[in-house]
């Protein structure tokens, strides 16, 4: 039977090299704080307890993760990783297996960590890297047993050539860690209490020490600056792109796909290059997403098409709908089956019924559009009076002529026609034509100033130029 597990996440670092006012663990990875990714990994292991050791910006860090069931432990002075773990140990029973993670190592997976929990001694997570600069080296004896971890600043030239490095992640019993942490010394180049010195302490009391390797190259990469953050972001995105491809979502250009949340999808879906999916995104069967699209917290049903460079946020697109290109569906938009929203159309808190169309250059806000209604190019629902929003209701099979303004609150009846250029300020009845525009007037002989340098029709008896000045003699 597995011992109960307590996870300790070290998140006290200030992150000076980030050049940011935010604590390092709040830096975003795929749209979420670094620490959130580590917490998700920790909770996936089913621990009895999760402890986060914080320091710089602790209030910010805790507030950003208030929904997580964790214990917050302050490290008042940053005296090293060993000291940080020691701060959390008083709350952990001796019989618990303690897994130590880092808030700036977000790529490690639960599958990699489970073997550390299955051991009965001190289990280390190691990696082989082509350039070990900056890492602590794992030193073995002639029999291959782990004898020490030597930090970069304390390593001699021979030790620095070792390419087997310590990732910093380890597991041991709480009772053992408590004993080892009490014996730590800060007699080193940094003047800190190193957690890695637990190796020597474990060997001294006969506790087995094992080093297990990561299952994926770069999985335990830490983040100290924006360059490394960008590298980890790229690795994260490539990992998810590969998983989505394996799960049946076609990504036309996987290296140009960004996920900042989660996506569920049906069969035969395709996502073109340069698309970004944020929050919770659900794609039905056969959904086609064009290049440069941004999808945020939305549902797109079977057979719908989203054209290039469209933004869809907190919206619901029904089956068989066509949207875009260059459309913007804002929060509260619902398109029912077969509706169409075309290029340079913006919607907000609007419902378009089955088969309704707004194909060009239109704004539909706070509106209910009936089935098969057609909104001509340049139609605007004037929903805001400077203080409050008002709704527009358009009946089924209504036709709104191009360039019309519907001043809410207003209703257009079923099968009504609104003449092009109308400014509608009162309800339009069903089965009727409503026109609200001035008649066109023709002025014979008019020539625009670009042709004549003057306005109005030519007149030999006109003594006053168009500019209003005196006539030249």
UniProtKB/Swiss-Prot annotation:
Chain segments carrying region Disordered: 439-473
Ligand binding (acetyl-CoA): 377, 383-384, 402, 420, 437
Region (Linker): 227-247
Active site positions, chain numbering: 360
Binding, UDP-N-acetyl-alpha-D-glucosamine: 10-13, 24, 75, 80-81, 102-104, 136, 151, 166, 224, 330, 348, 363, 374
InterPro entries: Bifunctional_GlmU, GlmU-like, GlmU_C_LbH, Hexapep, MobA-like_NTP_Trfase, Nucleotide-diphossugar_trans, Trimer_LpxA-like_sf
Cofactor field: Mg(2+)
Keyword Repeat in record: yes
Single GO term (MF): UDP-N-acetylglucosamine diphosphorylase activity
Residue pairs linked by disulfide bridges in the UniProt entry: none
BP GO annotations: cell morphogenesis; cell wall organization; lipid A biosynthetic process; peptidoglycan biosynthetic process; regulation of cell shape; UDP-N-acetylglucosamine biosynthetic process
Cofactor annotation remark: Binds 1 Mg(2+) ion per subunit.
Segments of this protein annotated with the region N-acetyltransferase: 248-473
Catalytic reaction(s) noted: alpha-D-glucosamine 1-phosphate + acetyl-CoA = N-acetyl-alpha-D-glucosamine 1-phosphate + CoA + H(+); N-acetyl-alpha-D-glucosamine 1-phosphate + UTP + H(+) = UDP-N-acetyl-alpha-D-glucosamine + diphosphate
Pfam families: Hexapep (PF00132), NTP_transf_3 (PF12804)
Domain of life of the source: Bacteria
A GO CC term assigned to this protein in UniProt: membrane
Region called Pyrophosphorylase, residue ranges: 1-226
Binding locations of Mg(2+): 104, 224
Keywords: Acyltransferase, Cell shape, Cell wall biogenesis/degradation, Cytoplasm, Magnesium, Metal-binding, Multifunctional enzyme, Nucleotidyltransferase, Peptidoglycan synthesis, Repeat, Transferase
Biological role: Catalyzes the last two sequential reactions in the de novo biosynthetic pathway for UDP-N-acetylglucosamine (UDP-GlcNAc). The C-terminal domain catalyzes the transfer of acetyl group from acetyl coenzyme A to glucosamine-1-phosphate (GlcN-1-P) to produce N-acetylglucosamine-1-phosphate (GlcNAc-1-P), which is converted into UDP-GlcNAc by the transfer of uridine 5-monophosphate (from uridine 5-triphosphate), a reaction catalyzed by the N-terminal domain.
Record NCBIfam families: glmU (TIGR01173)
PANTHER family documented for this protein: BIFUNCTIONAL PROTEIN GLMU, NUCLEOTIDYL TRANSFERASE
Name recorded for this polypeptide: Bifunctional protein GlmU
Species the sequence originates in: Halorhodospira halophila (strain DSM 244 / SL1) (Ectothiorhodospira halophila (strain DSM 244 / SL1))
